A protein has these predicted regions:
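Hydrophobic alpha-helical transmembrane segments of multi-pass integral membrane proteins
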Residues: 1-192
């Protein structure tokens, strides 16, 4: 029997690049950030680096793995899964690069918070908001109403990111936002 491979499969192999699927830049970024974040954390703890994070190293470390790392993994997954769930094309090329750049800008801005100031917080929070809005648009256009619950969880995670920043800047009791974020991450895993 002869196997027929759809033409678009050949095309995707031919143009297999970092920006052809959302999972590629974000999962690579998450993996590299996990290693770099740990290296920066260890360097700071041993006195070999002095990050200008603007708040305590423990808070920065917790934030970067709850929102930086998870934000990249969640974004990469949703950009890929949305195509299967909605039947619509996902972001590729320059729009995908811009979204990945937003994630990377958040990591850099928070590491140099003392230089960037409160703008760093807006840059950081923007990724989850943009991903939630993009995903909501895809769901509405595909009339895939069941997955609106994922949008609600992403928006709740973005809200916990805002609350985290609010706490570490000493406007609220510390720790609640981090626990909320962890609970929301578990909820996302269960729903997805």
């Amino acid at each position: 029997a002869r196997v027929t491979v759809p033409q678009n499969t050949h095309d995707s192999w031919r143009r297999a690049s970092l920006l052809s699927h959302g999972i590629r830049p974000f999962f690579l970024g998450a993996a590299l950030w996990a290693m770099a974040g740990m290296a920066l954390w260890i360097a700071a703890l041993t006195g070999h680096a002095r990050p200008a994070v603007g708040y305590g190293l423990l808070a920065w470390h917790a934030h970067e793995f709850l929102f930086g790392y998870v934000g990249a993994v969640l974004s990469g997954f949703l950009l890929t899964a949305a195509t299967n769930w909605t039947g619509r094309a996902s972001l590729t090329g320059a729009p995908l690069l811009a979204l990945f750049g937003l994630w990377l800008a958040g990591r850099i801005a928070l590491y140099f918070y003392a230089s960037v100031g409160p703008y760093a917080l807006g840059i950081d929070v923007a990724l989850l908001l943009v991903v939630a809005l993009w995903f909501a648009r895809e769901i509405v256009l595909a009339r895939d109403w069941l997955n609106l619950r994922v949008v609600a969880l992403i928006l709740a995670l973005a809200s916990s990111n805002i609350a985290f920043h609010h706490e570490v800047l000493r406007y609220a009791a510390p720790g609640i936002a981090a626990r909320l974020a962890l609970a929301l991450i578990v909820a996302l895993i269960m729903v997805i």
